[in-house]
């Protein structure tokens, strides 16, 4: 059996994000780009990450820092819980929780990422991180309090 895609889609990697990371296809929308970028972090593919950051971010300038993070971070899972791709042409959003261990310490990134489409390609531009109280419902949709879920 083939390897499942790290993005959490429950599809085989060869039928999911591999086509984007290999350059065979461009991600068709923000949610697919979000998933493929998460897979690139898992696969330690700095080239793909840099290629999919918006050119204004000058991602090439922090390649060394990115690659250093690969050796310290183990990615544990992605939950994409909201996507808004059609309100403004050429701009889209994807909200997610990405769980990880960094130097054996658990953590989570909770973000609403913003993507821009230029010349037919979607790029990650930036993101905002919500302020979540420990007793607030977890934004991943589990129904648990944040402190008992992604906030651990």
Swiss-Prot record:
SUPFAM superfamilies membership: NTF2-like, Sec-C motif
Pfam families listed in its UniProt record: SEC-C, YchJ_M-like
Highest taxon listed in the record's lineage: Bacteria
UniProt xrefs under InterPro entries: NTF2-like_dom_sf, SEC_C_motif, UPF0225, YchJ-like_M
Coiled-coil parts of chain: none
Family as reported in the entry's similarity comment: Belongs to the UPF0225 family.
NCBIfam families attached to this UniProt entry: PRK01617.1, PRK01752.1
Protein name: UPF0225 protein KPK_2103
Organism: Klebsiella pneumoniae (strain 342)
Lineage of producing organism: Bacteria, Pseudomonadati, Pseudomonadota, Gammaproteobacteria, Enterobacterales
């Amino acid at each position: 059996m083939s390897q499942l895609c790290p993005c959490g889609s429950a599809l085989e990697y060869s039928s999911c994000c591999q086509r984007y990371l290999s350059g065979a296809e461009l991600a068709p929308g923000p949610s697919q780009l979000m998933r493929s970028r998460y897979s690139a972090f898992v696969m330690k593919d700095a080239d793909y990450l840099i290629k999919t950051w918006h050119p204004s971010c000058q991602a090439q300038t922090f390649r060394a820092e990115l690659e250093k993070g690969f050796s310290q971070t183990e990615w544990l899972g992605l939950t994409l819980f909201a996507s808004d791709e059609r309100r403004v042409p050429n701009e889209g959003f994807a909200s997610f929780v990405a769980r990880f261990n960094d130097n054996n310490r658990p953590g989570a990134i909770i973000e609403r990422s913003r993507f821009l489409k230029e010349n037919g390609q979607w790029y990650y531009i930036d993101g905002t991180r919500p302020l979540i109280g420990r007793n607030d419902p977890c934004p991943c949709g589990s129904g648990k309090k944040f402190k008992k879920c992604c906030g651990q």
